[in-house]
Amino acid sequence: LHLLSRRQRQMCIRDRNYHIFYQHFPYDNKWGTMHWGHAITKDFVNFEHLPIALYPSKDFDRNGCFSGSAIEIDGQLYLYYTAIKYAKENPSNVHNQYSDDDLRASQALVVSSDGIHFDNVKNKKQIIPMIQEGFIGDYRHTRDPKVWKKQDGKYAMVIGSKVAYENDYCGKALFYESEDGIHFEYKNSYQEPTIGNMWECPDVFKINDQFFMIFSPENTDQPPKPNSNARYMPIDFDEDTLTIKEHGDWPYLDHGLDFYAPQTFLSKDNERLLLGWLRMRKPVQGEEWIGMFIMPRVLKEKEGKIIQELYPKIKNSFNHEVQEISFDQPFQLKTTLNKDSSLNLGGFKIDIQDDRLHLNREEVSIQENKVCNDVVSPKLQGHYDIELYYDHHVFEIYINGGEYVMSQVVYDLNDQVIIQNTEYKVYVRSL
């Protein structure tokens, strides 16, 4: 059920199919010169992988096609991405820059008439050159353009960046506008010095009458996950001027340890869907993939907060009740815990500590994760309803009807299953 990928960022609907694009290094399961992989699905259960959509082919993107977004304009599919060029090549590894100062980032576009074939030679163009003004953004670290059509018919773009602040940097979102989806003009920006020194993968969207911005800050001062997190904040947003007037708090979208780089789009039913990437520090032994998508979530708004629900088509697929848990197949587990409850699912442990759901994966982790194995939810006010999904070395846990979600990557589960001190029935269902 989890689409395997290096890192996701781009989704859209075309011809009744969901098109999913993702960063992809086709030669190894580690970081390298980024291409765009491409898959389509009608239901997020069955996927068809298509040929690589984007690959480096121009001087301005010769060292990689980083993340971006996709949108249909006048019957054609527009792919926006960050083009990467190194000012100085690294003689020991052509897939990494010689130093951070040698990175050059610009924003580029490819247009396809059928959404399947992308001419990387004739149909590429650089639409926003490398930033020259340091007070606007960073010439090295400005990336992940998200484009949407505004109510007035114009196109807006938000890009993640950073600017110098005191003795460090602070994260920043840059806003651009276009009449035709090709020629963009810088309009506005928003920065916040208290949450990370670089913002990746920004997205602005509306649920009901409330605008939200989501982003993935780097190098936050909040352990245990300074670089594997995504935040959202309700914003008072003027879409005409692309101005964030004020904002609320910025809670986590996912309270697990591996969630990063989410992106939203509208479903066929006009619901706001979210996909995100689960970061992995190393591949599962014997596998050729590293990293995966979460299962898609439907986002809803309640009193200025985001509530997340599993995409109904997937949730309804778990309709066969089983008596025993097997980690060889996906399963759903639903129950209500109390303050003395505990679950041990193959070495992945769940209990309640100080009114919080506590997750520990120390027994099913890797050495590289040794400082990131223990995490807790926010306080739950004595209510501990959980809806847990397991598939492909990952647990996704929805708490109290999607008020919070926690996702965790695990390695090498054992066969042990121990469920203790639950007053309520435990329901386990498979596909």
Task: Name what the model sees in each region.
Residues 14-52:
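Beta-propeller domains
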Residues 77, 84-93, 97-189:
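Hydrophobic, small-residue-rich alpha-helical packing segments that form membrane-like cores
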Residues 17-20, 76-80, 153-157, 210-213, ...:
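Entry beta-strands of beta-propeller and related beta-repeat scaffolds
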Residues 5-7, 28-30, 45-72, 116-149, ...:
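Surface loop/turn signatures of beta-propeller and other carbohydrate-active proteins
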Residues 234-431:
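Beta-rich accessory regions
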Residues 1-4, 8-9, 13:
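Single conserved hydrophobic/aromatic residue that forms the stacking wall/gate
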Residues 35-43, 97-115, 171-181, 226-240, ...:
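Beta-propeller blade signature
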Residues 24-30, 83-102, 160-168, 216-227, ...:
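Short, conserved, GDST-rich strand-edge loop motifs in beta-rich repeat architectures
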